[in-house]
Amino acid sequence: ELAEAQPLLLDVREVHEWEAGHIQGAVHVPLGKLDEGLADLDPAREIVVYCAGGARSIDGSYVLKRAGFGNVRSLAGGLAAWQGAGNETIIS
């Protein structure tokens, strides 16, 4: 129940970027494969899209919104801002 209340963090960076580190609990779907990955995402859930610096996440947000996802945001500044604010990333 608590997990569903939290937004889904969607990482749209490339595989090598994901492997170098990402936000714990995030789901990885590279931007170029987002159209084919839409079926795996819940359109009713809040989704926060992120990338390295914020540009690709904006593009990813538009893809989701065009597909009918209503509660979508882009993480301003991307992973760089996340880490700059002192938040951790993991390697998995």
Each predicted region: which residue ranges?
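Rhodanese-like catalytic fold shared by cysteine-dependent sulfurtransferases
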Residues: 1-8, 12-92
